[in-house]
Every structure is written in structure tokens, then in C-alpha cells.
Amino acid sequence: ACAYTAFANEGIVTRPFFVTRIEDKNGRVIYSAVPEQKKAINTAYNYVIVDMLKYVAKVIQGKFKSQIAGKTGTTNDYKDGWFIGFTPEIVISTWVGGDQEFIRFNTLPDGQGAVMARPFFEKLLQKIESDNLLGFGKNSVFMKPEEEMIEIDCSKYETTTIENNEEDKIKKSSDFDE
């Protein structure tokens, strides 16, 4: 989950912490957490990755006020299912599985991360968004950086071919559609 904080935070990794502050009985703050942060990836590259991960979560986006992105995961033999999802303000990682080898699902439709772990992410984020006491920023979106971006449309990077030289011709994905 720590690595995904970079995607949610414009390329800056934030080390997770659990206690944000401690007050004494009189309300004086005796401890306040200072998040440990480090630049991990260029902002423009980070946005491209986030844009791809938004596509993974597209099927559930309509359930949320904030933009979301995420990634599913499934281990061999459908023993573990993962979903790590995030908004610009929070990263949530969910896991469903067993600690014994014999505890597993028998088929991919039942045992994939999108089926067994993602629903927990969905329920938790819906609760967080609906709880006004948490101060969670509703309707938050991933901001596109102002710097020059690389194109996500791969067709812009296709190499041109020399028609007379058969060896140099490059097959395109559409050539394999037959």
C-alpha cells in the first residue's frame, strides 16, 4: 500500500502512520505525527500510471463521489485476492485469503481479487465518503500536471515502415485481428 501513496499523491511516497496525534486530558497536543515523504516518480509519469489505474476501477467509479483508481491481484490457485484502490486523498488495500494452503477458491470467477477483495474496498470507501465527521474531501479528482505530458495514445509512437523493404515492415495489432 505504501508504494501506491505515490500514485495518489502526485509522485510523492508517504510512509503510512496510524496515530495522527495524542492529547492529554486538558486537550494539549503532546504528540503530532509528521508524515515522512519522499519524491518517488516524475509527476507527469505518475499521472500516466494513475490514468491507466483509473481504467481498472472504471466499472465501480459511479459508486463514488471522488475519482478512484486501483489494481486487482490474484495469487496462484486462487488462494489470495487483492484490491488496492485510491483517491487523491486516501489509499486502501484489501486482501481476502487464507493462511492454510487448502483454504482457497476453486475457480477464477470466484477467486479473483475483483470479486473477493474489491467489494470490501467499495464498502469502506462508501462509508468514508458518507461520514461528514472524517473531513474526507469529497469530489476530489486527480489533477493533470501542467508540464508537458507523454501521450497515452500508443498509436502516436508507431514506427513508420519502408514499403519496399519486407524485413522492415512492422506488424500492428490490427494485423492480428483476423
Give a label for each model feature:
Residues 1-166, 170, 174:
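A penicillin-recognizing enzyme superfamily signal
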Residues 176-178:
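Short, solvent-exposed mixed-charge patches
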